């Protein structure tokens, strides 16, 4: 379950002004990167679901951050379907980012009061995103 609610996460992102996006298959390397970012003032970190062992590494990062980086909101990126979003939310994701807008992911996140930032690459995709979303990720097409 998420440690921080939607508003807290969005405030952390706003106050930091950026969100590092990272993946590595080695949990120890990933922990060092999370800690370095935290020590540098980052309070929201996106780990991407893009490679081998992503689920296992993410679970370790969440546990590590709870102890070593208590104000860090750990989110998951590259999410394209609701089942994967739900799995990462069970592992402790505080926010979900995707390369596209998927209304089913939005429902999963909204039920849990977790921030969802869909990617949009066209005006049409922006138009499909509900008005209640305050953050969209723009992608070049």
Q: PLM features: residue spans?
A:
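Active-site-adjacent beta->alpha loops and helix N-cap segments on the catalytic face
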Residues: 49-64, 83, 98-111, 123-127
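Conserved N-terminal beta1-alpha1 strand-loop-helix module at the mouth
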Residues: 2-74, 79-82, 90-91
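Catalytic beta/alpha-barrel core
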Residues: 45-50, 73-79, 93-101, 115-121, ...
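Surface-exposed charge patches
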Residues: 11, 35, 86, 107, ...
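Acidic-residue sensor for enzyme active/binding pockets
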Residues: 46, 125, 140
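Conserved small/polar residues in nucleotide/adenosyl-binding loops
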Residues: 134-141
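Feature detects long, helix-prone N-terminal segments enriched in hydrophobes
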Residues: 78, 84, 88, 116, ...
């Amino acid at each position: 379950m998420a440690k921080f609610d939607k508003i807290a996460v969005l405030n952390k992102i706003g106050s930091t002004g950026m969100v590092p996006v990272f993946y590595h298959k080695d949990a120890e390397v990933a922990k060092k990167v999370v800690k370095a970012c935290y020590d540098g003032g980052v309070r929201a970190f996106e780990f991407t679901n893009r490679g081998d062992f992503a689920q296992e590494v993410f679970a370790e990062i969440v546990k590590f951050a709870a102890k070593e980086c208590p104000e860090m909101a750990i989110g998951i990126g590259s999410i394209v379907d609701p089942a994967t979003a739900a799995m990462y939310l069970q592992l402790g994701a505080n926010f979900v980012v995707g390369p596209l807008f998927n209304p089913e992911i939005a429902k999963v996140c909204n039920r849990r009061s977790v921030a969802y930032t869909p990617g949009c690459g066209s005006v049409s995709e922006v138009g499909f995103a509900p008005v209640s979303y305050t953050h969209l990720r723009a992608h070049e097409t």
